[in-house]
Amino acid sequence: DVLIPRQDTELLVEQAITYIKSVKGNVDVLDMCTGSGCIAISIDRLCENAKVTAVDFSQKALVVAKENNALNKADVTFFQSDLFENVEKQYDVIVSNPPYIKTEEIESLMDEVRIHEPMMALDGDCDGLKFYKKIAKEGRQHLRSNGIIFFEIGYDQKQEVIDLIVKEEKYINTYSKKDLYDNDRIVITKVG
């Protein structure tokens, strides 16, 4: 019912944790499209100053995330939301590993992914950017001043994701970071 966490996501978690630990005082974190909850749980366990909330559209994913939360003795708050639909408050950090594979590319994925992973966790629509567009558009109203977004991206999506963020004219200091294999893997942007 959830995407199996992979090594690609480690950079996203590391960068978010490094930032959160650098902030003096408490940090409210929203994990958008939480899936198994691994990102939210890692941040909660490793950042004493973080208060973590995690949302997902899938009730089945939330059941798994809550089980993982209990198994890891974490204190993440989970609730169902179609992106920001049920999100009412503002956060200091939004972290997201949304579905980002183009619909037409799903059939060409490795069997271990295509057959065993839930389609909902993979399919980013025809251009793979559906969730980035929505989060960039609506995210600003759910971020406090100096808020920051951390996105995991597909290896070939850097420029498209940066362009759509810049187009919103709500963010500054938008940049990417490469993973251990020299692929662009995350995009980071701050409230302007």
Locate the predicted segments by residue.
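Conserved Class I SAM-dependent methyltransferase catalytic core
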Residues: 126-190
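Class I S-adenosylmethionine-dependent transferase superfamily signal
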Residues: 16, 43, 113, 135-139
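Mobile active-site "lid"/loop adjacent to the S-adenosyl-L-methionine
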Residues: 100-130
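Short glycine/threonine-rich catalytic loop with a Thr-x-Gly-x-Asp
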Residues: 5, 35-36, 180-183
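Conserved SAM/SAH cofactor-binding pocket of Class I
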Residues: 11-108
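C-terminal beta-strand of the catalytic ATP-binding
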Residues: 100, 190-192
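Conserved SAM-binding loop and adjacent beta-strand
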Residues: 2-14, 130
